[in-house]
């Protein structure tokens, strides 16, 4: 009971800090966005404001990820379980991702068999979509020069698998060992070594576990990184 109280207090503290950060951050983003609309700005000023907007959005995403990771870790994230079609959810996530990230150096290929139109499971639609989106973003984050991303939904008896892989730079055997056996390695600062996989993958693992599943990390058949949930 005492441990549970400490876990709840920690989760509430993180939620409070997240809220306190989001409020001034929203003001910074709002003012920066407003200033960007000024026709009298010099090119340098536009670039600097654009950096402020992008980095503020990045910080906001990190705060949201930290809050979600904390709630998932301490079973404080409400789950809305319903019968969903995993194929449709992941396909829509891919479509939304393409529409909001139109960079040509990150083409996404949908490799799910045409015959697999439906794969029904009891799951939280929002969390499954979040997990798939995090995997797509992970490939982009770790391949700044670009890569092709391959998405497959597979059915195995009464379970569904989501496979996201790329043909990017991949990871070493040492990094793979740490990612598979030391979950908190995924949270380490990316400045410490050349390859880190922050809160995004940790959240994917937590979402899989909430649904009674697992996350497997490995080398892609295309030469890059692969994650299966």
Residue ranges and their predicted role:
Residues 166:
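Acidic ATP/Mg2+-coordinating residue in the GHKL
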Residues 54-59:
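Short alpha-helical segment of the dimerization/phosphotransfer core of two-component systems
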Residues 138-140:
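Short helix-loop "hinge" at the ATP-lid/N-box region of the Bergerat-fold HATPase_c
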Residues 74-79, 118-123:
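Conserved micro-motifs of the catalytic ATP-binding
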Residues 212-213:
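Conserved glycine-rich
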Residues 171-188:
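Short conserved segment of the HATPase_c
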């Amino acid at each position: 009971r005492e441990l549970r109280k400490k876990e709840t207090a920690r989760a509430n503290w993180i939620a409070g800090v997240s809220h306190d950060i989001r409020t001034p951050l929203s003001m910074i983003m709002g003012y920066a966005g407003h200033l960007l609309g000024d026709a009298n700005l010099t090119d340098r000023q536009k670039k600097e404001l654009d950096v402020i907007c992008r980095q503020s959005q990045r910080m906001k995403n990190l705060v949201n990820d930290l809050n979600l990771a904390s709630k998932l870790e301490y079973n404080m994230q409400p789950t809305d379980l319903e019968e969903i079609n995993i194929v449709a959810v992941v396909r829509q996530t891919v479509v939304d991702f393409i529409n909001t990230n139109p960079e040509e150096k990150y083409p996404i290929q949908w490799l799910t068999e045409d015959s697999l139109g439906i794969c029904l499971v009891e799951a939280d639609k929002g969390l499954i979509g979040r997990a798939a989106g995090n995997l797509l973003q992970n490939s982009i984050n770790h391949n700044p020069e670009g890569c092709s991303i391959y998405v497959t939904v597979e059915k195995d008896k009464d379970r569904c698998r989501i496979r996201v892989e790329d043909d990017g730079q991949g990871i070493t055997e040492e990094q793979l060992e740490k990612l598979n056996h030391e979950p908190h390695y995924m949270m380490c600062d990316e400045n410490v070594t050349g390859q880190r996989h922050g809160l995004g993958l940790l959240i994917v693992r937590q979402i899989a576990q909430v649904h009674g599943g697992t996350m497997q990390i490995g080398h892609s058949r295309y030469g890059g990184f692969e994650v299966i949930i």
